[in-house]
C-alpha cells in the first residue's frame, strides 16, 4: 500500500521483517501498518487518525498525478489534430 510521506524505519527490520521501501510507501506487517508520518516513528493502524490523514494525502497526490496526465494527453491530442506541430 503506497502512502504519501510514509517511511518504514529500522525497527520494522528489527522484528525480522525485511523491507526496502521508498519515502512514498509503508508496509503492512501482520495487520500493523509501519510508517513515519511527519517524523513520528511508530506504526499506525487503519483506525488511527494518522492513517486517515495519510490516506487523504495519498488520494490527493494521486488526483494531481491523474490531472497532470490528462493535461499531457490533451496537449498531445491537440498537436496531432494540428498536424504534429
Residue ranges, per PLM feature:
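A short, exposed loop/beta-hairpin motif centered on an aromatic-Gly-Thr core
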Residues: 43-57, 61, 65
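Short N-terminal "domain-start" leader segments
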Residues: 1-38
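Short, solvent-exposed coil/turn linker segments
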Residues: 23, 40-47, 79
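Short intrinsically disordered terminal tails
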Residues: 1-2, 78-85
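Amphipathic alpha-helical coiled-coil segments
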Residues: 59, 66-73, 80
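Short C-terminal domain-edge/linker segments immediately following a structured domain
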Residues: 37-40, 65, 81-83
Amino acid at each position: 500500500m503506497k502512502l504519501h510521506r510514509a517511511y518504514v524505519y529500522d525497527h520494522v527490520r528489527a522484528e525480522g521483517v525485511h523491507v526496502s521501501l521508498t519515502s512514498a510507501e509503508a508496509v503492512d506487517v501482520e495487520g500493523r501498518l509501519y510508517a513515519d508520518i511527519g517524523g513520528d516513528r511508530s506504526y499506525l493502524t487503519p483506525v488511527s487518525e494518522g492513517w486517515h490523514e495519510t490516506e487523504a494525502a495519498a488520494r490527493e497526490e494521486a488526483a494531481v498525478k491523474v490531472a497532470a496526465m490528462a493535461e499531457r494527453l490533451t496537449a498531445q491530442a491537440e498537436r496531432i489534430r494540428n498536424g504534429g506541430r
